[in-house]
């Protein structure tokens, strides 16, 4: 059945007729974009398991993804463009063959580090950055702490909470901007 066209050059359906026969139509793959995030790990790799969202699927269909891609830098940041590499769509509730992988964006979140340290009793509540040690858990990356914090009292105790005050992460062999401070304890 023909219908009237629209716009400035629209045709009127009654001016045309369809001749019997077989008509063909091409259905193309629907492009989808991906997004996801992970915590800083010093690599530029984006694994399929890091992808959490697919945009532009039809009728709420779901897909999954395998393989890996990359981002330009390993530094923590938002909306990084994903080079698709070997990332491949796989079936979910929708058939992957109906879709094409168009592009992706990715966030690398700063990794939270816990900070611990010890010092000899000195009668004060002040905690110096030099009293503290950070284990990043990322390769051989090392951070230091600058500034001062404080404890609730000067008494000797294990696992005392430290209020951050002016304590701040500083780069040593790791980039401090890839990390955020978690709990700080002093023994």
Where on the chain are the PLM-derived regions?
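Short loop/turn motifs that initiate or flank beta-strands
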Residues: 1-187
């Amino acid at each position: 059945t023909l219908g009237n066209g629209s716009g400035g050059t629209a045709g009127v359906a009654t001016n045309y007729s369809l001749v019997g026969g077989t008509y063909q139509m091409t259905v193309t793959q629907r492009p989808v974009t991906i997004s996801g995030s992970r915590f800083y790990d010093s690599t530029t790799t984006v694994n399929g398991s890091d992808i959490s969202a697919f945009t532009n699927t039809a009728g709420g269909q779901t897909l999954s993804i395998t393989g890996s891609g990359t981002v330009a830098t390993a530094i923590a940041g938002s909306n990084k463009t994903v080079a698709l590499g070997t990332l491949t769509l796989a079936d979910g509730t929708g058939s992957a063959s109906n879709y094409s992988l168009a592009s992706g964006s990715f966030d690398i979140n700063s990794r939270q580090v816990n900070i611990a340290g010890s010092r000899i009793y000195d009668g004060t509540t002040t905690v110096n950055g030099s009293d503290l040690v950070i284990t990043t858990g990322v390769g051989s990356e090392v951070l230091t702490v600058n500034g001062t914090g404080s404890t609730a009292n000067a008494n000797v105790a294990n696992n005392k909470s430290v209020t951050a005050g002016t304590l701040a992460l500083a780069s040593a062999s790791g980039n401090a901007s890839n990390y955020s401070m978690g709990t700080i304890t002093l023994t």
